[in-house]
Amino acid sequence: MEQISSFEIWYTFFYQLSPVWISLFIAFSALFIWRKNLGILGHLCSSPIGLVGLFIVLFWVFGAIFADLVALFEPFEQSGRYRRKPPGTINAELGIPYIFGTDTLGRDLFSRMIYGSQIVLLIAPAACVVAYVVGITLGLPSGYFGGRSDTVLSFLANLVLAFPVILLFYLLVAPGVRETMLPNIMAGVFFLFPIAFALMVVYSRFSERLNVLIPSFNIIIIIGSWLYSGLVFNADPLGLVQIDPNELNIFAAVVFASSPGVFRLVRGLTMDIKTRDYVAAAMTRGEGPFFIMIWEILPNARGPLIVDSCLRVGYVTILLGTLGFFGLGMEPESPDWGSMINQTRSYIRLVPTIVLPATLALASFVLGLNLLADGLREESAKD
């Protein structure tokens, strides 16, 4: 079968990623132009490590956004004639090259790698955001008030953290568990926290202005109930909000495993920051505890939380890859990176490059997050 040269392979690779390169140029131009107004993110301009990490992360973000433009084939498109072909093999019928070759079912590895980034970037950051909302909602009052509730919550957090994470994930996403109501129950509990946190933020700001507080509460409850019904019960009357049951199962498992760590971090930061002079000044002004937690303590804890969020998304990405490698969670034909590695690892001796696309994608994304976290840590330490 006809193949293109190595130079043509890389030329096609970079050409197909044109929307990504253009988006990266615009993003970094905006970063350098408005760096003085972007806070800690703008400070990354003076951190080469942080810029490299941000470049890698944004590469995959834009790759996921423009996957339909970048990919040459559909992620599930098969061709029995082109199974396990090396990089650069040309599809004679279409005249289109398989940039990184094909897998055992004749699916384009480059296209599946690009579409796989959508799955990772859909689940990992979103689950970490919910985990942070859960950890912040419980960690702020626990660290601020202390008492028996703090003791109970700390014990439960330590209990969850004592489990090996891989074993915990296996127990939560096993096929038998997916068929029960446990994922929906867990998701139902976790998705209550964003609503509770939004209510807490509004109350802390407008507790003495009922003309603003009550309408704001009503809006939050209405929008929250709509999103809640779609995400947890797949019962959105408008049909706009829904999530695949397999993804919901993984989502709930990620939040369950990540929330205790966030809780402990927020609790520790709260116990430290509440002793600062500006918190005492807020108490002297007569500010309530919820105002102090939301508007005095939380903003001053943002540095460690931002750094930890980058590391946590990378950690969750590795866990998702591990689950996919063991065939857990996602559908067997899913183009997520872990499943791709699992599906191609048996043919390394026949086609040594067959596992490289998914492996390098997973490794580079996690590396980018770690470098970005290092850069943010350096800049937050300077502040």
Model-found features: residue ranges?
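Membrane-embedded alpha-helical segments in integral membrane proteins
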Residues: 1-12, 32-36, 117, 148, ...
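Periplasmic/extracellular loop-to-transmembrane helix junction in inner-membrane transport proteins
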Residues: 1-20, 40-45, 73-128, 339-359
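N-terminal signal-anchor/first transmembrane alpha helix
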Residues: 7-76, 153-156, 218-226
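Hydrophobic cores of alpha-helical transmembrane segments in multi-pass inner/ER membrane proteins
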Residues: 23-30, 93, 193-197
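Short helix-capping and inter-helix turn/linker motifs at the boundaries of alpha-helical repeat units
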Residues: 31-32, 88-90, 269
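Residue-level preference for alpha-helix termini and adjacent loops
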Residues: 68-72, 83, 98-99, 324-329, ...
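Alpha-helical transmembrane segments of integral membrane proteins
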Residues: 107-383
